[in-house]
Amino acid sequence: MLFRSHEIFDTYGAELARLIRAEMLAHFWEEASGYEVQVSRGFTALKTCNFTVAAGQPAQHHRATVTEPGRIKQMLFGGFERCLYPLQKFDSDTERRFAVLLERDALKWFKPAKGQFQIYYKLGSEQPEYIPDFVAETDAWILMVETKARADLDTQEVQAKAAAAARWCRHASDHAASVGSKPWRYLLTPHDEVVESQRLVDFLRFEVKDLPQASSPTSN
């Protein structure tokens, strides 16, 4: 059974245009000086998400306890009020539990589709696309969030993704400031910190920041 997200555009079209503004979209490319980001103006719609599930399998409520976490990738979840898509799939129960927090604390949120942000990171000779777990809007910020097993936080791939996303958020924030929009923050969140007693603001301590590179001194 194939679910599509076309129907959300009639309901949320104007809101999507507001949230998914072009300061959110950037392209990374590698130069001698490192990663550079170009952010253009304009608007873009959310990418259409297609979900495949077994015939006859209903969507589960996102707050329902998952008794078989190993099967969660095969499951479809609904019952959202603040998600920009009516249905979502999760790669882990940690993601589902984080979505519960977003439903409570965020203004709006969604799980980006491939190609939505076009963030690329360097891993050896490859430059794969990085797709973060969540993007959420709050009163003060727009948060890009990755939830990850604590044991994997310091791996080369996770750190490369975090560095690319943090730099993307810094450039997006610079552009947002020029047009009066909210700044972006990238959060790399350990899985064992995702508990319902936490508030979304509590996760700001896991922010990964990209600092502007100092200019090289010029010789006379």
Task: Say what each PLM segment does.
Residues 1-128, 137-143, 148-220:
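Intrinsically disordered, low-complexity, repeat-rich regions
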Residues 131:
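Active-site lining segments that contact anionic ligands and/or coordinate catalytic metals
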Residues 134:
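Phosphate/adenylate-binding glycine loop and adjacent helical scaffold
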